[in-house]
């Protein structure tokens, strides 16, 4: 809905829902440039409009995958240190985690900056690892879980293993071609 709102404000044809689903995961500017042929300047304006809607309504137009709360609770109780590394702006990610009462499971919630200085998934992952105090020699003890190719690429760029999950927005072909170490489905 947020992308549709932005495109309408820019007098752009929205197209089909399948194209809009591709926006989930990668940085918004990249998706606007790639799928709607926008210039960098137009994409930045699109992000501005996207956030007008998202900050008020879109942020809460989501739902929790079945079994996620139980899985997070189990992993935390088993002693795993859990964190979020998302291309979504950090302040939005924290609000969503609070809404669903998930913040309690995470040692940290890390995301992109609103000013665009931190948006690449690999950089967000590195930012999270640095803030968690994880040294590079211990990256072999870290596993990223993600549902899109940018999650896989970001983990690989940091030298960490990654599990591609099929319950999100990516599909098997996308996760395999990106090089996921493991594939899981719920």
What are these regions (language model features)?
Residues 33-70, 78-80:
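Metal-dependent phosphoesterase signature
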Residues 3, 71-97:
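Substrate-recognition element of Asp-dependent hydrolases with the DxDx(T/V) motif
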Residues 69-77, 129, 152-156:
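Surface-exposed amphipathic alpha-helices with a cationic face
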Residues 1-22, 36, 77:
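Active-site neighborhood of HAD-like aspartate-dependent phosphohydrolases
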Residues 143-184:
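Acidic, Mg2+-coordinating phosphoryl-transfer loop and its flanking beta/alpha structural elements
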Residues 121-152:
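Conserved Lys-Pro-Asp/Glu-containing loop-to-beta segment of HAD-superfamily phosphomonoesterases
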Residues 6-7, 27-40, 96-99, 124, ...:
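Helix-loop "lid/cap" segments that line or gate small-molecule binding pockets
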Residues 18, 103-118, 140-141:
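A short, structured active-site edge motif that brings together acidic residues
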